[in-house]
Amino acid sequence: MPRLQQKWLNSRECPTLRGEAAKGLFPTKDDPSAHKRMSPSDKDILILCCKLGIALLCLGLLGEVAVRARRALTLDSFNNNSSVQDYNLNDSENSTFLLGQGPQPTSSYKPHRICPLEIEIRMLAKKYIFTNKTNPIGRLLVTMLRNESLSFSTIFTQIQKLEMGIENRKRRSKSIEEQVQGLLASGLEVKKGKKSVFVKIGDRWWQPRTYRGPYIYRPTDAPLPYTGRYDLNWDRWVTINGYKVLYRSLPFRERLARARPPWCMLTEKEKDDMKQQVHDYIYLGTGMHFWGKVFHTKEGAVAGLIEHYSAKTYGMSYYD
């Protein structure tokens, strides 16, 4: 061993392992086999493990005793209240509304391990379950009691949310008939939908509280013009990655960029007539009266060009 290291090990001013703590752990000049002698044998390790196991067992037993004592005390105080003795969730009266809500216990309901705040949950359950058996809050509480999954504060937050939702629904939900009566009194034309009421203002049907002044018919709702095509069913479609995609199946942003309302509203008869003409032109090489009107200008230049080229190239006319 180098002289310096040996000096440091023998030194009483060791910076990390001070004084006697270092003695017997490292080989020194006086005791070269100290580290071998001090290492624990297998027997020592076994004894230490046994001691640790016994200590843990004692701790567990103590905990179990404490839990049982607390449960006994809690149930004694709880059973004094007669109205809560009905809290047997397997009783048909209280559990009918829970059928279909999830797996039911196969044996009779046994009170499970009581967590610190279960008494408060039970008091809340007493408040909610017996007033209205279909109450979502009662159902939530029963689920929580069975699962033992969430803390009381979480459950309480859920209850508050549910209560707020119920209150809002109560405030909002007039029946459709009541809404119709109220709006008819205003002298407007009213029609009843599945979930709401519509009022006719001008020539459009509006839901209550959505009317924002006179409606202006603008030429387009989209920032870009429609760049796709119409098929024979008069559906708009565009080519995306080599596939024909109907614009109504596109997500909103793509649809917004590609789609716009038609230039003019056509009647069903006009649409059918155009489809028929397209069909005749493709399969029979005749028709296309409509396109003559579209392309015709005052001087007839465009129409003449079309006529000339189509007659020359394809041997057919756009007009009869």
From Swiss-Prot:
GO terms for cellular component: membrane. Residues 66-320 are extracellular. The chain crosses the membrane at residues 45-65. The keyword Transmembrane helix applies. Glycans are attached at N80, N81, N90, N94, N132, N147. The keyword Transmembrane helix applies. Residues 1-44 are cytoplasmic. It is found in: Membrane. InterPro entries: MMTV_SAg (IPR001213). Keywords: Glycoprotein, Membrane, Signal-anchor, Superantigen, Transmembrane, Transmembrane helix. It is a single-pass type II membrane protein. Superantigen. This protein is coded in the long terminal repeat (LTR). Belongs to the mouse mammary tumor virus PR73 superantigen family. This is Protein PR73. It comes from Mouse mammary tumor virus (strain GR) (MMTV).
